[in-house]
């Protein structure tokens, strides 16, 4: 339940895949509003990215518990086997959003006490993390892939770190673009989308790396009991060769008899 068939190498692959290869922002375009609005300064983008990564990691883990023990198929059997047919799947989205909103409110109160400047710089976008589609999308992606608990937590962390990395990279480039000579028709959203597309293309270069899927190895007893592949092929090929040779001989004899009949 906690790790399942996944090895720690697969878990590391899940983190890499969620952060770079299937980046939740650059591949699925989730959370674009706050990505474009809060990327004017690197410090603001860094704070928002850190908040999104924290919220996604914690709420992804909590919502996995909710899905496994409350709303999933046969989730209530731990209470009583008679509740196996009870399906609370229709409440799943509502509960997920409530969990995300509650943790976002806790994070907002903590930032207001700990980092007042970051709290003021994020403004309205901090409470909007509760309805950020990147948070809910990351949770739903992990749930639909049926990850065990630890892979789900690492996937949520990787998705949050991927969003964090994307907005910090974009904010860094955006600060440089402020002093660049950009054509008038491309200023604003135009150059922002072009820059985002180039960053996404750079992340796509890692597409071939896939170590996130568990490899089910065959038991040693099955390997010892299976006959040698070479012996199987040789024994099966011998009758086939004999049949082909006999057919070729029969065809040659038939052709010779036909020629003899014509000459006579």
From Swiss-Prot:
Its main location: membrane. Its EC number is 7.2.1.1. It catalyses: a ubiquinone + n Na(+)(in) + NADH + H(+) = a ubiquinol + n Na(+)(out) + NAD(+). GO terms for molecular function: oxidoreductase activity, acting on NAD(P)H, quinone or similar compound as acceptor. It is a multi-pass membrane protein. InterPro entries: NqrDE/RnfAE, NqrDE/RnfAE_oxidrdctase, NqrE. One of its GO terms (cellular component) is Gram-negative-bacterium-type cell wall. GO terms for biological process: respiratory electron transport chain; sodium ion transport. Keywords: Cell inner membrane, Cell membrane, Ion transport, Membrane, NAD, Sodium, Sodium transport, Translocase, Transmembrane, Transmembrane helix, Transport, Ubiquinone. The chain crosses the membrane at residues 11-31, 50-70, 90-110, 123-143, 149-169, 189-209. Composed of six subunits; NqrA, NqrB, NqrC, NqrD, NqrE and NqrF. NQR complex catalyzes the reduction of ubiquinone-1 to ubiquinol by two successive reactions, coupled with the transport of Na(+) ions from the cytoplasm to the periplasm. NqrA to NqrE are probably involved in the second step, the conversion of ubisemiquinone to ubiquinol. NCBIfam families: nqrE (TIGR01940), PRK01061.1 (NF002200). This is Na(+)-translocating NADH-quinone reductase subunit E. The gene is nqrE.
